[in-house]
Amino acid sequence: YEELCVYYLMELLILTHRLSSEKPRKSNLLTMQEMEQAVQYFSQNYNSPINIDEYAHSHNFSISWFIQSFKQYTGTTPTQYLLFLRISNAKNLLENTSFNISEISRAIGYENPLYFSRIFKKQSGLSPSEYRKKYQIIM
C-alpha cells in the first residue's frame, strides 16, 4: 500500500511539473505574439502620434507590463523604439530625397522642425543639415 501511495505521489508531482512548465510557454508565446503586433503597429504608424499608455490600455495591458514585455522582446522601450524608427527614416529621407527639413520632420511625425532637429542631433551627433551634407547619395 505504501509503495502504491509513493507511486501516485510521484505521478502527481510529474504531472504538476509538466503542467506548470507548459503554462509559461503558452504565456510566453502569447506575449511574443502581442509584442510582435506592437512592433508591427509602431513600424507602420511611427509617423503618427502614438501614445504608449493608450496603446497598452486599448489592448488591455497594464502600462508597466507592456513596457517591460516590449523591452524584453525588443531590447528597448516602446518610446525608444519609436524614436529609433523616426530617426532611421529621417536619415533615409535625408540621404535619398531633396525634401527640406520641415517636410522630413512632418513625414516622420514631428510637427515642429526645431524639435525634430534637436532630437536628431542628440541621437546622431549631427544636425539634419550636417547629416545630409555628409551622407546624401548624389542623385
Give, region by region, the residue ranges found by the protein language model.
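An amphipathic alpha-helical interaction segment
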Residues: Y1-K26, Q33, Q37-Q40
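Alpha-helical structural signal
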Residues: L9-M10, I63, T79, L83
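Short helix-to-coil "ATP-lid" hinge immediately C-terminal to the conserved N-box Asn in the Bergerat
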Residues: R18, K71-Q72, K121-K122
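Terminal helix-turn-helix DNA-binding modules in bacterial transcription factors
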Residues: E36-Q40, Q44, P49, D53, ...
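Helix-turn-helix
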Residues: A56-I63, I67
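Residues within the alpha-helical elements of helix-turn-helix
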Residues: S58, A107-I108, Q123
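Key DNA-contact positions within bacterial/archaeal DNA-binding proteins
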Residues: S64, L114, S129
